[in-house]
Amino acid sequence: MGDFVFCYGLHNKNRLSKYIKQTKKGYKLYLDDDNHIKIKIETRSGQKYIVIDFNDSLDFLKFIVKKKIYCDEYKHDCNSLCLHNDYLEYVIENKHYDIVKFYCKKFVPLIKSNISVYPFSFSLFVDIDLDDFKYMFKYSCLEDINPYFIYVLGQSDNITIEFMDDIIGMYKSKLTRLFTNNKISDSNIDNIKIGLQDFIKPVYKKDDVNLFDFIIEEIHNLTSEIDKTKLYKKQLGFLKIFEFYYELDTKTINRFINYVLDCTCQKIFERLLFNLGNIDLLDKTIVRDILEFNMVEYMGIICDFIGDTNPELINKMLTKATSTEMAQLLIDCGADYEKLYKSQNFRKCNDCVKNFIKKLVKETSDS
């Protein structure tokens, strides 16, 4: 288990054969004049590969990185990337962090330089340990690790404030370094950005308001350590793109609220509503959906937010209610059902709501 398998096609063979010696007991690959490792040469699906025992794999990786030996797998039929991914998965699962560091920092750039891949895509390991992922994230290029990061944020059920503190801190550090070294460009900016919506995905798992507040605050300060006085004009333009990208404005809040409606996250919904600050800024389609799909819990939050400041809106929502539960809530919150009953809008109400209001009116008149 954990063998490193490396393409031994014509390109690599021309580079490697001078370092390989065949003996009666097999093959040796000389790392230098005095040191060698044992290797196997195998044919798999018509393609030749070198197989290196796991215990020698880091030495071999250092050797090929130093010699800059790698093939372009797209020009022949080798299965290198898949085989390397199997190796990396084994390394991560067994927490060989020294190898993870070298693989991400040195070996991946070698692959990218030879097969013209930008960015490099890590295959997704299902249920990766979060500490293992943090280590990968720390030593990977942002454009390479970001798709995997977004996957982890959306899939893991165990993300904590401590994890997000570490990961956002690393993201901030990488971002600051890229800006400081003038490494942001038109070609890589989209691969470097991680959306605010992606950052807050973990909060939906447990309706975690504390985690939400923490992430929003940290993202707000994401570019705070970048010295604007040392940036070129174009870098300043890219910085403005990032700052706008992470702004929690009205449009963004409404987009988040739309997402929350499908997640049963009343606490997050309430926080977003209060961040909005004014009920008039809430997208009308959100109110429509809450009424149409009878989301009574969300309507309760809206009513608490409105209080007695907007009776006209409460009355208007009563005409759109689709259940007696929703109608009762709105009436409890001040909706004037008697006024609705006498108006032309009453005939537009849902049948169950009409029957409910008729009953209330009758009970009131009889009392």
Curated annotation (Swiss-Prot):
It comes from the Viruses. Belongs to the mimivirus L17x/L18x family. This is Uncharacterized protein L178. It comes from Acanthamoeba polyphaga mimivirus.
